[in-house]
């Protein structure tokens, strides 16, 4: 799953990222790109995020945890 998330985020941001990437370490990850990332992840994984969840999506690990929780439910 991590590879899929990284692929989606890399394509959306137009830069190479890894599992340690966060908003604070990626200059291209601004608020507009954040929304693009969320939409791409929702489409790829066929799920929806709540506004509160979107606000916590600040790094790859947190995003993966959120997606895993949603898939289990």
Per-range role (PLM):
Residues 11-28, 44-56:
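Phosphopantetheine carrier-protein modules
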Residues 48-72:
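C-terminal structural segments of small proteins and small subunits
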Residues 30-38:
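Amphipathic alpha-helical interaction surfaces in cytosolic regulatory modules
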Residues 1-17, 68-73:
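Thiotemplate assembly-line natural product biosynthesis machinery
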């Amino acid at each position: 799953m991590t590879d899929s998330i990284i692929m989606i985020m890399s394509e959306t941001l137009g830069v190479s990222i890894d599992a340690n990437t966060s908003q604070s370490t990626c200059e291209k990850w601004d608020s507009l790109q954040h929304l693009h990332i969320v939409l791409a992840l929702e489409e790829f994984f066929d799920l929806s995020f709540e506004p509160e969840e979107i606000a916590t999506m600040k790094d790859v690990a947190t995003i993966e945890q959120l997606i895993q929780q949603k898939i289990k439910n």
